[in-house]
Structures are given as C-alpha cells and as structure tokens.
From Swiss-Prot:
<feature type="compositionally biased region" description="Low complexity">
    <location>
        <begin position="751"/>
        <end position="761"/>
    </location>
</feature>
<dbReference type="Pfam" id="PF19314">
    <property type="entry name" value="DUF5917"/>
</dbReference>
<dbReference type="Pfam" id="PF19311">
    <property type="entry name" value="KELAA"/>
</dbReference>
<protein>
    <recommendedName>
        <fullName>FHIP family protein v1g243165</fullName>
    </recommendedName>
</protein>
<comment type="similarity">
    <text>Belongs to the FHIP family.</text>
</comment>
<feature type="region of interest" description="Disordered">
    <location>
        <begin position="739"/>
        <end position="761"/>
    </location>
</feature>
<dbReference type="InterPro" id="IPR045669">
    <property type="entry name" value="FHIP_C"/>
</dbReference>
<dbReference type="InterPro" id="IPR019384">
    <property type="entry name" value="FHIP"/>
</dbReference>
<feature type="region of interest" description="Disordered">
    <location>
        <begin position="781"/>
        <end position="814"/>
    </location>
</feature>
<dbReference type="Pfam" id="PF10257">
    <property type="entry name" value="RAI16-like"/>
</dbReference>
<dbReference type="InterPro" id="IPR045668">
    <property type="entry name" value="FHIP_KELAA_motif"/>
</dbReference>
Length: 866
C-alpha cells in the first residue's frame, strides 16, 4: 500500500489533456540521453506495478488515471527526443512494447471505455508532438490500429470524438510526410488478421458532413488523402471500389439542397443575387456551400477515378434528379430562389471539371422538352423579380468565357449571317480605326445631360448639338500609348492643357482602361476556342477545323480566371458529349431559324425587347440588363463584336441594331422629361442618391457582417468619398454596388429572422433620404412630392403692362402644366430621370469598349501575354 500511495502522490488528482499538452520536461540543458532514459524507465516500472495490482487494492478508475499519468510522461520524453533512428528512449519503448501492453491491459480491465478515451489522447499527443518518425514501427502502429478498430466498432461518446478525429487527421498528415505510412494505415498492407480490411480513410467518412471543428478536420484529412491518391493509384482504386465516399458526397449535396429555403423574402428590388460573405448567417446555405466547396477541392486534387465517379454522381444524382425538377416548379417565388441558388453555386466553383458538369446540365438537359438554358432565356422577358435573377445568372455564365454557352446563346444564330446583307460580310472583320462607332455612341447621350456634363471644355458653346459635343470630347481627349510597359496595360494619359473637363476626361480615360483590361482578359480566355467566328465561309471553316488538330481545342469552361496552358487542359469528355448535342454540327437544321427571331436568336431578341423599354424599366432592371449587354461587348469574336459595336454595318430589314434601339431610347426619355420643370436639379439629385445609395449599401454590409456603424452624413460628403464614388458606371454598379447590397432574408414556412430591414436596406426610400429632397430614389415608393422640392417655385415679377402680364400668365400656365405632369406621372418621371443618368454613363462605357476593340490589335502580342 505504501508503494501505491507513493505512486499516487506523483500523479495529479484530475489530469487533463490540456495539462498534458502544456507539460514539459523540466530538465537542465546538460541532461543527457541517459537521464531521459532513466526517467522513462522509472515511469514504465511504475506503470507495470500499477497494472499488476489487484483490483481490490485500488479502484479501476484510479489505476487508469495513474497509469495514464506515467504514460503521458513517457510520451513527453519521446516528444523532446531529437530525430534519430531511433533514439535511446524510443528504442527502450519499442523493446518493452509499452503501447501494446497498455492496450491489451485496457481491453481486459473494467474501464475499457475510459482506457480507450485516455489512450486516444495519448496517441494524439504523441502524433502531434513527436519529431521522430515514430509511426513506422510496428510496436507503435499496431496498437494504434487496434485501438482505432475497437473505436470504430462502437458508437463514440461526443467528448471522445474530437481526439479521435484529431488522431485520424494526424495520421493523414504523417502519411503525406512519409509515404511509407500509406501502406500501413490506408491500404491494409499488413499481416495482422485482427485488423485486416481496415483503413483510416473509411473512418473519416462519417464525419464529412459534420459541422464545426470535427467536420473541418475530417474534410482537411480527406483532402490530404485525395492528394495521396493522386500519387498512388492504389488508394484511388480503394476509394472508388471499397468505400462509399463518392455516393455520400453526392447524396449529401441533394440532402443539403432540399434543406434550403424554398422562397426568398426580397426586401428591395435592387437585389438579384446571393453573395458570399452575406449568407453566412443562414446555416442551411452555409452547409450546402461547404459541401460543394469540398467536392470542388476533391475533384481538383483526387485520382482521376475518384474524379470521374464523383462527377458522374453529382451530375445524375444531384443536378439531373434534384436541380432539374427544382428549376421546373410552377411557383415564381420558388423559381426565383432556385435560380439565385444556381447562380451562387456556379460562382462558387473553381474547378473546371466540376464547372463542365454544371454547364453540361444547362446546355444538354431539358425540362418539358425545352433545354434548361432556353427556359432561363425565356424568363428574362418577364416582368418580375425572376427576370432580374435570371439576368444575373446569365451574366455569371457569360463571365465563364465558355465557347459552348456563347455559341448556344448567340453565335449559332449569327454564323449564317442572315442578320446582315450578303454584301456586308466583309464588314464583319473591319476594324473601326477612326472611332466612328464610339462617336456615334457619344452622340446618343440625351441633350439634357449636356448642361450638367463635365466632359466638355469650358469653352463649349451653350447649346451644342450632339455631334458637336462628341467632337469636343474627342478633341479634348488626347491619348498616349505607353508601349514601354511590359506585361502591363496600355496607359492612357490626358494632356495637361485640359481644364474645364479634367474630372470627366479622367473618368472617360478610366472607362478606357477598364474596357481594355476586360477585353484583354476575355480575349486571353477565348484564345483556345475552336473557331474565330469571323463570318468566313462555313464549309471552309468546317474543313479547316477537321484537318487542323490545333483547332480541335475546346474551351467548354475556362472559369474564374483560369487560362489554358495547353490543349489538354481545355479538352474534356464533356466537351465531346456537349458537342454532339449542342454545337459543332452546323447542318441545315441548325441554321433554320424561326422567322420571328431571324438572324438573332431568342437571347438577343429578348434582351433587345427588354432594352427597348429602358425608359419604363426600373433602375435595377436596367442596371443588370445593361451589364449583360456590356459583357457581351467584351467578347472579341468579330460576328458578335460587329453586330453590337459596328455602326457602319447594314442589317437586313426587320433586324434592329443596338444603335437603333439606343437612339429610340434617347427620343423616348427626352419626350418624357421635356415637360418636367427643374430637370437638371432632378438629374443632380439622382446622381447624389446613387452615391448615397452606394455608401449606405457598404455601411449596411458592414453592419450585418462586421457590426460596423452606418457612416455619418459628414463622412458621406467627404472629398475622398466623393472622389471615389464620382463615377456611376454600369459595370461598377453591377460588380460592386448591387452585389454588395444586403441579402434577402431567407425564410421557410416558419419564419426565420430577417436581416432585411429599413436600417440595412441598400436602397433609399423616398422618405428616409438623408438629403432634404430625398424624394427621388431608385426604389419605388411615394413620389407625390417629387416635384415640389425638386423645382423652386418661380415668383412672377411685378408688371406694369398687359403684354408683360400675358407673358407671366403663359409662363405660369406652362409651369403649372409641367408640375401637374410630374404629380400625375411620378413613376414615369423617376424612371426616365434614372434612365438618363444610366444611359449617359453606359454610352460612355460602350464608346470606350468600341475604341479599345480597335486599339487592341495594334498592341504587340508580347504585351498581351500574361
């Protein structure tokens, strides 16, 4: 009994794993291996005496605690031992077979479960702290495998799972450092029948969809295993043939998708997409995206067998069976939610193979006999939030720079050149070196903007025509191309003699720089396309494509900034399958178009029909609509570029060009606002509201995500903020301002807490504007007083004669008529005002894109390489 008391006094009353981790050997620096070896010997002898005691002498739990104390001290010594093969302390542990003896004693004791828990902690401490490759020795890995096997056969308590998964992750880390461990822990390459058919990888599968740290550790460990499978094909074959890893991932996606809310409570009409970082408060969406991101990472690094099986299961088990039916629902709210989810999923994918699966699903699969992509295009023409969300998804798809998508939407209808006269085919490849199209775009800026625009020099006449305004702008901008820049963008610099228009001239130069960057990036990612789409003869093109192996390269998906390094990176099995069904068969059937959409196809026809109503559309509909058209303008393919940006091309009767539609819009908005008093003040306040909306949107995001207070009125009016927000560009609104707006509050049949409130709304209502006139806002609301603060009431001067009095009466009647029109048509006036503001900026952007398309072929090829 005296020995037991002595040993018990050495152990803490309640040792914990945290205490073990913080415990260090308090030994002087000069203590040699002999002293450490002596210390290990003392602890092991004490342990043997504890295990040899009768159970009646001391309780089993007390014996377990004392034994684990000594074992942890031995592990601490091993962790401090230098990397030798093996060191004296490790050699002593191996010779004594300490770990196996302790394991066997634990299985025969009355505290088997407690011993399992404590041994798992010991092995976690050993794996995480050991510097030597201790796991390669059978005296260590055999008892560890036996311990893991015994844990796998029973349900683990929750307080034990953390250490258990940590041990499994540590084994995956160690196997990546030493490939020898792959045979021992993953491939069952040992001769012990009691643990045959056992692999560490299979133990991780039940934790793949867990939340919290357990799920993170398990997924990280599996990714390490995937990296090993890419090195050793045996592991890849084992995962595919012997485990249910891939089916669990695919089924998990379907199950998590079914948990997503079926409707979105949209607080404002400026919303059209779900953004990363703003959906973090919704656990269902976070869980699905976590699983999707894990599948994406697995496909990136796993063995090709694992990739193929997982992709097939995701396509058939999730997309075809679940997503397809979700996209054919009858409820508009449900369709809006599913479309927004799909948009978010596509934007979250970074692996090209997984993106190919999603693109194939959109191009090949049908709902009610109609391809899913065609259904999305048809929804664009609706007057609902579904149309806006569908436009957002289309914009995301266009950002992929995918040949098959653009071919299906646009190019297959433009290839026959039925939209232009036969004599105009040569103009498809012409380059607008003299910027005639850019000048035409600028000439379409509404005349009411000329008084406010700062793009003209101060010497400009008071009432210039559209053409003279364009000429003045073109003369004011002198562009220098700095050819000395290597691997950089061409730099544009205004001449120092510009004075009155410096601010907006710099603004236009920024449009040019942004357009150049966007066009160059798009051109780089389209460089591997199989055709140039320049309007050449189809038969010769087909022959050249068949005979030239280089032209067989495909770019089904080059997503999220990926640039092809070789043809093998671009080609894929999906490209071949999608080719048979969607593209590459330019037969007579492909070229027979419906008469109603002759030459353009349903996508461009729907876009143009919606664009024709720009004066009546809401601000946010116009925002995403113009962004989609702008994204189409970035593509360098001559067929599409000439149709959208070439003013000189002659179209067939019945086919309207973008210039004709913009000219019609200009006339419409000018007709609406010609009777509006104080129009210039309304335009100024519309611009200010857009700047204020941007600042409030950013503050709302910060308050939701980081609990940052909304900026004050003074901070909004600061010079730095005003300079940063001076440009109201369509693409900037799209990429930053709208998408950074607050997310809709997700709701189920039973309510979930909504974050969409007045305090977090990114759009200004007519009553809560910080400006005194806050009566002109993109968001529809009460606009009854839109005209009163917007235009000051003119006071009639005193008159002494009848003619003067008659003039005053006529002036008063005209002003009364204008104010009456504004009071009776507040929605029309507001839409027209915001349409003018957007149209002016969009026309500048289109002009810049047109000029950059002409300039880019002049830049040396080495400057265009990444």
């Amino acid at each position: 009994m005296s020995l037991l008391k002595k040993l018990a006094s050495l152990a803490p009353a309640h040792p914990s794993h945290g205490d073990v981790e913080r415990r260090e050997i308090a030994a002087p620096t000069l203590v040699g291996n002999a002293e450490y070896l002596k210390l290990v010997d003392v602890h092991w002898n004490s342990s043997q005496q504890i295990m040899g005691l009768d159970s009646k002498t001391v309780g089993p739990q007390e014996r377990c605690k004392i034994l684990m104390y000594h074992l942890n001290e031995i592990v601490s010594v091993l962790a401090e031992e230098k990397e030798e093969c093996p060191g004296p302390c490790l050699k002593y542990v191996l010779d004594e077979n300490i770990f196996e003896i302790v394991f066997m004693w634990g299985t025969s004791s009355y505290v088997n479960e407690l011993m399992k828990r404590e041994q798992i902690k010991v092995f976690r401490n050993l794996i995480e702290r050991s510097k030597a490759p201790i796991l390669i020795y059978e005296q260590v890995w055999k008892p560890l495998l036996c311990l893991l096997h015994s844990c796998a056969s029973t349900k683990l308590p929750s307080d034990m799972e953390e250490d258990y998964v940590a041990v499994l992750k540590g084994l995956c880390v160690s196997a990546n450092r030493d490939i020898v461990l792959l045979d021992l822990f993953f491939l069952e390459n040992h001769n012990h029948s009691e643990i045959s058919g056992f692999s560490v990888f299979s133990l991780l599968i039940p934790y793949v969809h867990r939340e919290g740290d357990l799920g993170v550790w398990a997924r990280d460990a599996m990714l390490l295993s995937m990296a090993l499978s890419s090195i050793d094909a045996r592991l890849g074959s084992y995962i595919v043939e012997e485990t249910n890893f891939c089916p669990i991932l695919a089924i998990g996606l379907s199950g998590l998708f079914s948990d997503l809310p079926t409707s979105l409570d949209i607080p404002s009409e400026d919303w059209y997409s779900l953004e990363r970082g703003l959906w973090a408060t919704f656990p269902e969406l976070v869980a699905f995206l976590t699983s999707l991101e894990f599948c994406n990472n697995v496909i990136q690094i796993a063995h090709h067998k694992v990739q193929h099986m997982l992709l097939e299961l995701i396509y058939h088990g999730f997309l075809v069976s679940v997503m397809s039916s979700a996209l054919t629902q009858s409820s508009v709210e449900a369709l809006t939610a599913v479309t927004a989810y799909l948009d978010l999923f596509v934007r979250s994918i970074t692996d090209s193979k997984l993106m190919q699966v999603f693109v194939k699903f959109l191009l090949v699969e049908k709902s009610d006999g109609v391809p899913i992509l065609d259904s999305l295009v048809a929804r664009i023409g609706q007057e609902s939030q579904l149309a806006v969300v569908s436009l957002g998804l289309i914009h995301t798809l266009l950002d992929l720079n995918c040949e098959d998508i653009l071919y299906t939407l646009v190019l297959k209808y433009l290839i026959p050149c039925t939209h232009i006269l036969s004599s105009q085919r040569r103009t498809v490849r012409e380059v607008d070196y003299y910027s005639k199209s850019a000048a035409k775009f600028l000439s379409l800026i509404p005349s009411c903007c000329h008084g406010l625009s700062t793009c003209l020099a101060s010497s400009r006449p008071e009432s210039p025509s559209c053409l003279s305004s364009t000429e003045s702008l073109n003369k004011s901008i002198e562009v220098k191309i700095d050819m000395k820049t290597s691997h950089d963008f061409v730099k544009y610099r205004p001449q120092p003699h510009v004075h009155g228009g410096e601010a907006t001239l710099a603004d236009y130069l920024e449009y040019l720089a942004d357009a150049r960057q966007a066009i160059r990036n798009c051109q780089l990612r389209c460089s591997c396309w199989s055709m140039q789409y320049d309007g050449t003869d189809l038969s010769s093109t087909d022959d050249a494509t068949e005979n030239n192996p280089a032209n067989k390269r495909r770019s089904l998906v080059l997503a999220n900034g990926s640039i092809p390094r070789s043809a093998s990176e671009v080609s894929s099995t999906l490209a071949v399958k999608a080719s048979d069904k969607t593209k590459r068969s330019l037969s007579s059937n492909d070229l027979c178009l419906p008469s109603a959409e002759e030459g353009l196809g349903p996508f461009l026809s729907t876009l143009f029909r919606k664009l024709e109503n720009m004066a009546q559309n809401t601000f946010y509909v116009n925002l995403i609509l113009t962004a989609v058209i702008t994204r189409l303008c970035y593509y360098p393919q001559p067929l599409l570029k000439s149709f959208l940006l070439n003013y000189n091309i002659v179209l067939k009767p019945g086919v309207r060009s973008l210039f004709q539609i913009l000219s019609s819009i200009k006339i419409k908005v000018e007709n609406v606002v010609e009777s509006v008093e104080g129009l210039h003040k309304l335009l100024r306040r519309a611009r200010n509201n857009l700047i204020l909306r941007e600042e409030k949107s950013k503050a709302s995001i910060q308050s939701v995500v980081a609990d940052v207070p909304i900026p004050t009125r003074e901070s909004i009016a600061s010079p730095t903020t005003q300079k940063r927000l001076a440009r109201q560009k369509t693409d900037t609104f799209l990429a930053v301002r709208i998408r950074d707006g607050p997310p809709p509050s997700l709701m189920r049949a039973h309510s979930i807490g909504s974050i969409g409130s007045a305090s977090t709304s990114s759009s200004l209502s007519l009553t809560d504007s910080i400006e005194s006139l806050g009566n002109l806002s993109p968001q529809f609301g009460s606009t009854a007083d839109i005209s009163e603060d917007a235009s000051p009431v003119s006071q009639a001067p005193e008159t002494t004669g009848r003619p003067r009095a008659s003039a005053v009466v006529r002036e008063s009647q005209t002003q009364l008529k204008r104010n009456t029109f504004r009071r009776k048509n507040p929605k029309a006036v507001k839409n027209a005002v915001y349409c003018i503001v957007m149209l002016e900026e969009w026309l500048k952007e289109l002009a810049a894109i047109s000029q950059e398309h002409a300039l880019l072929p002049l830049v040396p090829q080495e400057m265009q390489d990444v």
